[in-house]
């Protein structure tokens, strides 16, 4: 229970810390529960999207849904994506890439990358409201599971004391991996039309490409890499689903 609570405390800005004081050690064991947190963050997006979509155009409702998740998560993942893009865009060596990613100032790669990311996301407002709500919940959970596999396949690239959060995640046991997989995949099985199940492959492909990039450049991962992997896996799921729907 402490590990689950730690996951919600780490990945959201909601006052879960008021429920119970969680030992610092528990934050090393949060990775298997990322997809479970996706049920909350994706659920908030879907709820805001659905409710706002009843009284305004889907395009505006979609923007409000995106803002809602930014508020709930404190822009945690977007900050990671910006740092990731700055580091891999501006760094040519392992040491330089890590140094840039740790810099608190955003650079041109981060700014342009975030603009492109949100421009692509905004195109989803063309989808029917009900289907978009389902995609939001499914994509959040599954993409968090895909991103969690970075921890299983790569070592941490920095020393623990150099970590921004002062926490290095533990790798998952087989039963934790299974639980995360089921939690991430369940929305697909329960909500998505069967023709869209193949969309699960797009985040997996994105994960593999990012894994190869991190292994070659850093020989490991950082927290920023995890956030970037989640958002890019999610974006690939949305765009892949859009392609499947159009065709």
Predicted regions and their residues:
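Hydrophobic alpha-helical transmembrane segments
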Residues: 1-74, 90-92, 103, 109-247
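Glycine/small-residue-rich loop that forms an oxyanion/phosphate-binding "nest" at active or ligand-binding sites
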Residues: 79, 90, 99
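Coiled-coil dimerization/phosphotransfer module
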Residues: 97-100, 105
């Amino acid at each position: 229970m402490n590990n689950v609570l730690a996951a919600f405390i780490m990945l959201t800005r909601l006052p879960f810390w008021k429920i119970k004081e969680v030992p610092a050690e528990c934050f090393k064991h949060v990775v298997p529960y990322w997809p479970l947190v996706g049920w909350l963050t994706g659920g908030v997006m879907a709820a805001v999207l659905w409710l706002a979509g009843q009284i305004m155009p889907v395009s505006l409702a979609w923007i409000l849904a995106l803002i809602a998740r930014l508020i709930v998560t404190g822009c945690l993942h977007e900050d990671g994506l910006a740092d990731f893009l700055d580091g891999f865009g501006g760094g040519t060596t392992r040491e330089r890439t890590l140094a840039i990613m740790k810099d608190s100032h955003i650079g041109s790669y981060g700014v342009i990358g975030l603009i492109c990311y949100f421009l692509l996301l905004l195109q989803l407002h063309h989808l029917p409201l009900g289907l978009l709500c389902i995609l939001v919940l499914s994509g959040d959970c599954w993409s968090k599971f895909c991103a969690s596999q970075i921890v299983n396949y790569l070592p941490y690239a920095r020393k623990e004391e150099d970590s921004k959060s002062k926490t290095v995640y533990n790798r998952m046991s087989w039963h934790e991996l299974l639980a995360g997989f089921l939690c991430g995949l369940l929305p697909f099985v329960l909500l998505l039309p069967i023709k869209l199940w193949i969309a699960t492959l797009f985040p997996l492909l994105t994960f593999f490409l990012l894994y190869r990039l991190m292994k070659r450049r850093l020989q490991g991962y950082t927290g920023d890499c995890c956030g970037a992997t989640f958002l890019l896996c999610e974006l690939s799921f949305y765009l892949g689903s859009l392609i499947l729907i159009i065709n």
